[in-house]
Regions:
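Short, acidic Gly/Pro/Ser/Thr-rich loop/turn segments
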Residues: 10-13, 42, 140-144, 187-188, ...
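Divalent metal-coordination and catalytic microenvironments
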Residues: 26, 36, 47, 64, ...
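Active-site metal-binding motif and surrounding structural segment of the metallo-beta-lactamase
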Residues: 42-93, 194, 198-207
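Cap/insert and terminal regions of metallo-dependent hydrolase folds
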Residues: 67-69, 163-169, 173-269
Length: 275
């Protein structure tokens, strides 16, 4: 399978824009897949610059309902009139970032309600065909990131911590190889990997995901102890290659790289991979 990074916080090409967000294009023998749509429509311009025709996408997935992943969704729906977008049932929750200095809505734009006929609402594990499986409701809180603490769901007048019921992950299998795609891994990359292995019966061959080890609202990386513990878990897993970026953060990436070596790589906008 081919993977092209359409949007990420950094870029490796002068002709490709970057922004805080994530969007990936995945191509297999049977499917042309869009996974997340970045913070705005810039990922569409990037796709054109990279030779990716988004009008040919036949299926799309939204990893979760934060606007750095769904901000460009309406633009995609206007460009592509056929692809269904798979997302969790809880995407219409009221999701906020809450810090001592701000309380800001970061969820789905209400205008997207006009496109509900294009959406497929998912729950649990759903095998769509021999190539695609989406799963959610990841159990466990091992090595849970403190960067999640500022992410909240408004329920009535309260703002409890987000339980990430709106998060889902994707397994793509082709020619005996499987890649795991996660947006921010808010449920914890270690926990998500365990769920992926339970679904697959083995470890995926590659992982493309943000690891959420940096809090952009506070400008803080997770403590070294937590990052190192995540690195040890990933090193002990049988995944051949991890590709990360977006919400992982530069400090955490450097510490993980020291543990994982050539098994870990970055995935800036404009980069492409073959699994």
């Amino acid at each position: 399978m081919k993977v092209v990074i359409l949007m990420e916080n950094s870029t490796c090409r002068d002709t490709v824009a970057c922004a805080h967000g994530l969007s990936m294009y995945i191509e297999t023998d049977k499917h042309k897949i869009l996974f997340d749509m970045g913070p705005d429509a810039q990922f569409i311009d990037n796709a054109k610059a990279l030779g990716v025709d988004l009008t040919q996408v036949d299926i799309a997935f939204l990893s979760h309902a934060h606007n750095d992943h769904c901000g460009g969704l309406e633009a995609f729906l206007k460009l592509n009139d056929r692809a269904k977008v798979y997302m969790q049932k809880a995407v219409w929750g009221q999701y906020y970032v809450v810090t001592p200095s701000k309380c800001a809505y970061i969820g789905m734009d209400a205008v997207l309600k006009n496109y509900e006929d294009r959406f497929v609402l998912c729950d649990g594990v759903q095998k769509l065909d021999e190539e695609l499986t989406v799963f959610s409701a990841v159990p466990g809180r091992e090595l849970w990131s403190g960067a999640n603490d500022t992410l909240r769901e408004k329920i009535g007048e309260d703002y409890p911590r987000d339980a990430f019921r709106h998060e889902q992950d994707l397994l793509v299998t082709e020619n005996g190889k499987t890649a795991l795609f996660a947006g921010c891994a808010h449920c914890g990359i270690v926990n998500i990997l365990k769920s992926a292995e339970d679904v697959l019966g083995r470890a995926p061959d590659a992982v493309f995901a943000g690891f959420h080890l940096y809090n952009p609202s506070l400008g803080k990386s997770e403590p070294d102890e937590l990052v190192d513990a995540v690195g040890e878990k990933l090193r002990g897993d049988k995944v051949a290659h991890y590709f990360t970026g977006h919400c992982t953060g530069k400090e955490a990436y450097a510490r993980l790289k020291a543990k994982l070596g050539e098994r870990l790589g970055e995935m800036p906008a404009g980069s492409d991979f073959t699994v």
